[in-house]
């Protein structure tokens, strides 16, 4: 099974000076562990972090344009992210789908651009509370997965993020996470020629130091996409230690 990934999504937090201080604190506190760490920061922070993160900690973006270049004011291209040192980029986060009306087709286009530039897309999928209450979470999430990976190569990561658990303090149980992660892995095996076990599947949704170990102990969960807890270095170190 693949090395677990602790993907730290800062969302719209931290100025460049705050990012520099955070990276210095992490350098002092972090000890090598079993999990790979990746900081997914606002684009304006990436140049600062590229020269300040501890060795072995990867860098990534939170979004990317579906276009390669051109007259798209305010957009960040995959080539720009790659040039600044990014390895990963999130596509299709539920906040982008909700606040910016991103469709599965748009998400797939962004993932294709990311791969064309040498980035690894972290494709986010997951259901809302009303879908879960209807018992349709597996069908909904797999439909979203298929639409969001249309024409996308197999060098990707999938993050299962139940929308009802993001920023709410509610967390899917370890069994909930495993149910969807197993279904996603089976679906990926049908979509790609790579071995099913080679794909990394993350869980995202109110992940904290006190629940990450039980969630990531599930056989089909290979790490976590962490939001709020990623902003505090002590929490990051605790989560990294929990994945030893």
From Swiss-Prot:
Q: Name one GO molecular function term.
A: triose-phosphate isomerase activity
Please name the InterPro entries in this protein's record. Answer: Aldolase_TIM, TIM_sf, TrioseP_Isoase_bac/euk, Triosephosphate_isomerase, Triosephosphate_isomerase_AS
Q: Where in the cell is it found?
A: Cytoplasm
Q: What is its EC number?
A: 5.3.1.1
Catalytic residues as annotated in Swiss-Prot or TrEMBL: 93, 161
Protein keywords: Cytoplasm, Gluconeogenesis, Glycolysis, Isomerase
Cellular component annotations (GO), alphabetically ordered: cytosol
Reaction catalyzed = D-glyceraldehyde 3-phosphate = dihydroxyacetone phosphate
Pathway given in the UniProt record: Carbohydrate biosynthesis; gluconeogenesis; Carbohydrate degradation; glycolysis; D-glyceraldehyde 3-phosphate from glycerone phosphate: step 1/1
- Give the Gene3D superfamilies listed for this entry: Aldolase class I (3.20.20.70)
Read off the Pfam families from this record. Answer: TIM
Primary location class = cytoplasm
Q: Name one GO biological process term.
A: gluconeogenesis
Q: What class of enzyme is it?
A: isomerase
Could you name the domain of life of the organism this protein comes from? Bacteria
Residues the record lists as binding substrate? 9-11, 167, 206, 227-228
Q: What does this protein do?
A: Involved in the gluconeogenesis. Catalyzes stereospecifically the conversion of dihydroxyacetone phosphate (DHAP) to D-glyceraldehyde-3-phosphate (G3P).
Q: Which family does it belong to?
A: Belongs to the triosephosphate isomerase family.
Q: How is this protein organized at the quaternary level?
A: Homodimer.
| Classification via PANTHER family | TRIOSEPHOSPHATE ISOMERASE (PTHR21139:SF42)
Question: Could you tell me which NCBIfam families the record lists for this protein?
Answer: tim
Q: What is this protein called?
A: Triosephosphate isomerase
Which gene is transcribed and translated to give this protein?
Answer: tpiA
């Amino acid at each position: 099974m693949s090395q677990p990934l602790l993907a730290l999504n800062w969302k719209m937090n931290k100025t460049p000076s705050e990012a520099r201080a955070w990276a210095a604190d992490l350098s002092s506190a972090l000890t090598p562990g079993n999990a790979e760490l990746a900081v997914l920061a606002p684009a304006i922070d990436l140049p600062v972090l590229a020269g300040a993160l501890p060795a072995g900690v990867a860098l990534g973006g939170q979004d990317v344009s579906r276009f390669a270049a051109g007259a798209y004011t305010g957009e960040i291209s995959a080539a720009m992210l790659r040039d600044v040192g990014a390895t990963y980029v999130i596509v299709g986060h539920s906040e982008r789908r909700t606040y910016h009306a991103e469709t599965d087709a748009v998400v797939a286009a962004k993932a294709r651009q990311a791969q064309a530039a040498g980035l690894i897309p972290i494709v986010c999928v997951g259901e809302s509370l009303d879908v879960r209450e209807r018992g349709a979470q597996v069908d909904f999430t797999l439909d979203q997965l298929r639409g969001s990976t249309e024409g996308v190569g197999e060098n990707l990561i999938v993050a299962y993020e139940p929308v009802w658990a993001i920023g709410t303090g509610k967390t899917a149980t370890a069994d909930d996470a495993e149910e969807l992660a197993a279904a996603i892995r089976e679906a990926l095996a049908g979509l790609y020629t790579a071995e099913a076990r080679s794909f990394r599947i993350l869980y995202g949704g109110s992940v904290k130091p006190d629940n990450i170990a039980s969630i990531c102990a599930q056989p089909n969960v290979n790490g976590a996409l962490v939001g709020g807890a990623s902003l505090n270095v002590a929490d990051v170190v605790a989560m990294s230690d929990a994945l030893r």
